[in-house]
């Protein structure tokens, strides 16, 4: 609304957007959370980053920058961490697929539903921790976790496979790194 009257979108990308949930400035640009993914506003123009580029979901309710080069997004299916430089590259058309990481109940959250009933649903505290409103409380990522920057799953070691002997006879497996 400009001057208390609706604004008719001039760009086709805006015509599909029904809901705007939040905005933040990150990397020197305005990012807008919508029901159609993220919109980046630069010099009066909008570009879209959505599931077509690798976001796990399109309806994004809020976002918060972590101070370590990532933007964290909230939605009905969890929290997503994505590198800000990747978002910029995807919005510019220089990157076809984001390396977005989704966190949810399997990662220890009581609920992956992070739409919140009021704003803000995501917040960065002065100590660097990130707080997210969920349907069953608050999920918090501490600054130590964020600074590690390694969110990969731990290595898996298979020590025994009792089924193999029953099905295939006496087969021994040797797994090495």
Question: What is the predicted function of each stretch?
Answer:
Residues 1-2:
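Surface-exposed loop/turn elements that mediate protein-protein interactions on large endomembrane-trafficking
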Residues 41-42:
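Surface-exposed extracellular loop regions of Gram-negative outer-membrane beta-barrel proteins
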Residues 12-21, 36, 47-177:
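Residue-level "micro-hotspots" composed of small/polar
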């Amino acid at each position: 609304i400009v001057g208390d009257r609706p604004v008719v979108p001039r760009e086709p990308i805006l015509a599909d957007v029904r809901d705007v949930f939040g905005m933040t400035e990150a990397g020197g640009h305005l990012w807008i959370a919508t029901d159609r993914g993220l919109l980046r506003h630069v010099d009066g123009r909008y570009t879209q980053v959505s599931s077509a580029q690798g976001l796990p979901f399109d309806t994004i309710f809020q976002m918060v920058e972590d101070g370590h080069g990532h933007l964290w997004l909230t939605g009905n299916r969890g929290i997503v961490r994505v590198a800000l430089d990747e978002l910029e590259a995807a919005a510019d058309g220089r990157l076809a697929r984001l390396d977005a990481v989704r966190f949810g109940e399997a990662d220890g959250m009581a609920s992956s539903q992070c739409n919140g009933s009021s704003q803000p649903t995501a917040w960065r505290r002065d100590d660097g921790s990130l707080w997210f409103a969920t349907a069953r409380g608050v999920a918090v990522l501490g600054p130590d976790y964020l600074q590690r920057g390694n969110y990969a799953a731990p290595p898996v070691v298979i020590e025994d496979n009792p089924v193999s002997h029953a099905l295939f006879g006496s087969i021994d497996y040797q797994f090495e790194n």
